[in-house]
Amino acid sequence: YWKEDTKTLEEAQQNKIDHIVKKLNIKDGQKVLEVGCGWGGMIFEIAKQKKCEITGISLSKNQIKYCQEKAKELGLDNQVKFDLIDYRKVKGRYDRIYSVGMFEHVGKKFYNIFFKSMNRLLKDNGLFLLHTIGVVDSLSTPNKFINKYIFPGGTCPSFSQIISPIEKTGLIVSDAETLIRH
């Protein structure tokens, strides 16, 4: 997300958010779900830009508490909500679903369940966006440090490892983008 005129990490992060918001093509009044909301950066930015109802989910009590407090502080608590819940237990249907930086934690043996869950939650003609750190070669040796300290139980997948479980759910890949330099 380092465009030619990007000078700081904050600018690069904003470029990433703007890029994702553009791809999501959120319309006023739509219901949006972020799977793995972290500290709320994406949700708060989307809420500032779009008139939609956004739910963020996480398994971290600290993240949810922080996000709820930050939403009140920003005056966005009527537009956004945060739930401490596993993606497999979420109810409802959404026009847009996105996940940024969470899929690495899912683990290969749960890919089918993950994409089935996204398909179940997505309204007809809805859009799901997945942003993940990946590897170029699915046969490459996993990085022991990353597997132990960064994504324990998870992995950085290759595109080929992601596409098969997506296709099995009936989701359709309409766009795939590799952003090598960021």
In which residue ranges do the predicted regions lie?
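Conserved Class I S-adenosyl-L-methionine-dependent methyltransferase catalytic core
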Residues: 1-23, 27
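Conserved class I S-adenosyl-L-methionine
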Residues: 29-36
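Conserved SAM-binding loop of SAM-dependent methyltransferases across substrates and taxa
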Residues: 39-51
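Conserved SAM-binding loop
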Residues: 67-68
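A short acidic, Gly/Pro-enriched loop at the edge of an enzyme's catalytic core
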Residues: 88-97
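A short glycine-rich, Lys/Arg-flanked "PGG" loop and its adjoining helix->strand segment in the class I
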Residues: 112-124
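Conserved beta-strand signature within the Rossmann-like core of class I S-adenosyl-L-methionine
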Residues: 125-133
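Substrate-binding/catalytic lobe of Class I Rossmann-like enzymes that use SAM or dcSAM, i.e.
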Residues: 134-182
